[in-house]
């Protein structure tokens, strides 16, 4: 089992995963990331709508995901990493 899987499993079992997810959603909204991704999707849909086939949800996701990941601010990534480390440290201290 990888470290990532172990952390994921622990956060699910401890109930902290939803807290982390809520924090991520809030931070991405606050920094404007969600608006940027929404605009990116809209632009891709407009661009692809001119083609005869249009675009499927799977194609949109495949095209947007790598770009959206690069748009996540470093400060948000660092904050989430620190939160996860804190949760793991608290767990280790309890055991």
From Swiss-Prot:
It comes from Drosophila virilis (Fruit fly). This is Enhancer of yellow 2 transcription factor. Involved in mRNA export coupled transcription activation by association with both the AMEX and the SAGA complexes. The SAGA complex is a multiprotein complex that activates transcription by remodeling chromatin and mediating histone acetylation and deubiquitination. Within the SAGA complex, participates in a subcomplex that specifically deubiquitinates histone H2B. The SAGA complex is recruited to specific gene promoters by activators, where it is required for transcription. Required for nuclear receptor-mediated transactivation. Keywords: Activator, Chromatin regulator, Cytoplasm, mRNA transport, Nucleus, Protein transport, Transcription, Transcription regulation, Translocation, Transport. Belongs to the ENY2 family. Component of the nuclear pore complex (NPC)-associated AMEX complex (anchoring and mRNA export complex), composed of at least e(y)2 and xmas-2. Component of the SAGA transcription coactivator-HAT complexes, at least composed of Ada2b, e(y)2, Pcaf/Gcn5, Taf10 and Nipped-A/Trrap. Within the SAGA complex, e(y)2, Sgf11, and not/nonstop form an additional subcomplex of SAGA called the DUB module (deubiquitination module). Component of the THO complex, composed of at least e(y)2, HPR1, THO2, THOC5, THOC6 and THOC7. Interacts with e(y)1. Interacts with su(Hw) (via zinc fingers). It comes from the Eukaryota. GO terms for cellular component: cytoplasm; DUBm complex; nuclear pore; nucleoplasm; SAGA complex; transcription export complex 2. Its main location: nucleus. GO terms for biological process: chromatin organization; mRNA export from nucleus; positive regulation of transcription by RNA polymerase II; protein transport; transcription elongation by RNA polymerase II. Pfam families: EnY2 (PF10163). It is found in: Nucleus, Nucleoplasm; Cytoplasm. The gene is e(y)2. InterPro entries: TF_ENY2, TF_EnY2_sf. One of its GO terms (molecular function) is chromatin insulator sequence binding.
